[in-house]
Amino acid sequence: MSAAFPPSLMMMQRPLGSSTAFSIDSLIGSPPQPSPGHFVYTGYPMFMPYRPVVLPPPPPPPPALPQAALQPALPPAHPHHQIPSLPTGFCSSLAQGMALTSTLMATLPGGFSASPQHQEAAAARKFAPQPLPGGGNFDKAEALQADAEDGKGFLAKEGSLLAFSAAETVQASLVGAVRGQGKDESKVEDDPKGKEESFSLESDVDYSSDDNLTGQAAHKEEDPGHALEETPPSSGAAGSTTSTGKNRRRRTAFTSEQLLELEKEFHCKKYLSLTERSQIAHALKLSEVQVKIWFQNRRAKWKRVKAGNANSKTGEPSRNPKIVVPIPVHVSRFAIRSQHQQLEQARP
């Protein structure tokens, strides 16, 4: 394998003006014909079967020579077909300096520019053994031409595979690399979405106690012993969201009739039993959890009012002398009147 590299390296290092350029044509015996125009490099590696912009007419091989003479002449000119990965040698220099390669390709008159069909046949050699059974494919020149046509069709499919199997080498085509990058970016984009969704679910579960709770923090601080009489508010909030089917952050929109009945029940009885709660929820077409949380919030407001009244009675300078509890307009006059009576009775 190492003995196949010196001919190509010698060809690249040999002065360009020499008439005895090492090429397939010189091996066959016909003199190298000068190309009609300069070889325009299209940006792809020389062994890929992409056609250049200017295609010089290839010299036909002499029919007098047998096919056996053509077969051993191909491997020395194209030694890289025997090595699929091409980690060292001429192709590694291609990866390091593409500008030098393009200039050499443009100035060579008869070496590579005069044999595009051999390039296609060589590329077909590299791509064809995977889908086709190897061995007897390259015994005849007709097989080379058929494989050259097949290599064109296989190039688009094999390019994406090369981008993953041999991404470090020069053979990875631009299409395969772009597809590989697109897949990686899609994976990277999918992962943060999954993380954000899981984080949002966790955050909703952690902060589910905020749903429909306006004064729950003050309620916990003022009366820690009262928590034994009630179920934890977080489980109640989770139950309310599952029963109502609404978003966790959205408040429950009570109607004026529902608020009126709830205010009446609260002034009659501050704490409800399970049967009373179920009856009120059934009558108002609410869930028991919604009724329970409304009563918790209402008790928190009521205790804040009581705390303000106690401070004013004892003569201690209260930080908030007047606690105004906002009551909606559609609440009954009975509830408003009872609030005013409590505030007036608290004053000396």
Swiss-Prot record:
Keyword terms: DNA-binding, Homeobox, Nucleus, Transcription, Transcription regulation
SMART domains referenced in this protein's UniProt entry, alphabetically: HOX
Source domain of life: Eukaryota
GO MF, one example: RNA polymerase II-specific DNA-binding transcription factor binding
GO cellular component: chromatin; nucleus
Protein function: May act as a transcription factor for cell pluripotency and differentiation in the embryo.
Protein name (database record): Homeobox protein GBX-2
Species this chain originates from: Homo sapiens
